[in-house]
Curated annotation (Swiss-Prot):
Its EC number is 3.6.1.66. This is dITP/XTP pyrophosphatase. Pyrophosphatase that catalyzes the hydrolysis of nucleoside triphosphates to their monophosphate derivatives, with a high preference for the non-canonical purine nucleotides XTP (xanthosine triphosphate), dITP (deoxyinosine triphosphate) and ITP. Seems to function as a house-cleaning enzyme that removes non-canonical purine nucleotides from the nucleotide pool, thus preventing their incorporation into DNA/RNA and avoiding chromosomal lesions. GO terms for biological process: nucleotide metabolic process; purine nucleoside triphosphate catabolic process. Keywords: Hydrolase, Magnesium, Metal-binding, Nucleotide metabolism, Nucleotide-binding. It comes from Syntrophobacter fumaroxidans (strain DSM 10017 / MPOB).
Amino acid sequence: MEHAILVIATRNKGKSREIGKYLEHFPVEVRDLNDFGPIPEVVEDGATFEENAYKKALLTARVLGLPALADDSGLEVAALGGAPGIHSARYAGPDASDAANNEKLLAALSGVEDRAARFCCVLSLAVPSGPALTYEAFCEGTILTAPRGDNGFGYDPLFHYAPAGKTFAEMSLDEKAKVSHRGRALLELQREFDQVLKWLHARTADENLRRGVGHDMCVTGEDPRGTEPKME
């Protein structure tokens, strides 16, 4: 099978390298937005992580004409009705720092006994015509009353993962990757990537035929996991 090109919808080289490590043994060329010129910013106004991830993946795929993978993630706290949720990065305001977001979270949970929380990550892999595959994963934990650890970012210093007895900010990158929400979603993608590549090649063939470009691959619109892809 010929190599496919997959664009990671980020300019964060660390994130693109992390994703690329999961796919390095497959016939796919992983690129990110640094390999291309400027593209429009995505307005993340979706009501769910899935909607926002799909918007980012689809815009990137349509602008570049290549399959694109995007993620959206955040923290959901049970006692706060799932907040900060999709607003995790801007919980304390549009340009809030991690420290400000953490301070607001601690204030919101002041005196609250139920501190159960979970991180959620949704990956969306879209092709230019609209269909996409979606992967979702969670990591359950609790919110501490004070930060611990100097690694990580975001809410990592407050998120305690009981099986490890550590916050995410106390873990090494390798430790965190094995148990985190993003790591679990990427592992799910990795396990199915042979079938995902077949789906991508079939979709490419379909789109080439629509444009009148010859291609010798079979055309199919089936999701390799047995369910219909998400449509725009």
